[in-house]
Amino acid sequence: MQQHLSIVCAYYTTVNWRTCDIVILIERQPWQGAMSEPPLVIDVVDNGGQWTHREWRMLRYLGVDTQIIENTIPVSELRELDGLILSGGAARVGLTGELGNCGAYLELNIPILGICAGHQFMAGYYGGAAAEAQEPEFGAAQITLVNGGGQIFANTPETQTVWESHNDEVSTVPPGFFITASSKSCQVQGMENENGDRFGLQFHPEVNDSEYGQNMFQNFIEICKQNRNQD
């Protein structure tokens, strides 16, 4: 008897199960519809942080073409990117000022979000400073938006709970940057540059305990999309 082979793309296609002997299920990402534009390409730089995979997973969940890349990869070997995330890590950036090739990545003309160590490195690279925190933070903390919260905090409450895990912190905001969020223990919980393409977060939006972390990733994705459409 002749077998009928059907391929089912999740979310989009159904089949007549009675006439089909074999069914192959293929997960289709939300961006893969026939009329959709190509997905945004935003990679995550692995700086040795314990939650780097969560950043990658969040981007993928939100429909982004994303990979985790080592921070030693030369710029010449990067994909054509719409955005980049500099992850957190064990490196004491406030003491060493070093973080792989992240300095070279910051020369790229794309939106970049630094998280924890990535945030601290960004501050130092652009002329600010990071130092050992007087009160290291580990666990849930409450932050308050300042200066309107900037683009990353768009459509999130003025006061919210986030997840912290840091020994160092930004002590001096770079020229051309402004603070977007603060807490009682850390003045620079968030920062953004005046050009609107460099962003830093001291806390970890990728951790579930950060109430509006997904919103922040979505806001960054929208920034990357707008930047691509302008090119």
Language model features with spans:
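Short, flexible loop/turn segments with low-complexity composition
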Residues: 228-231
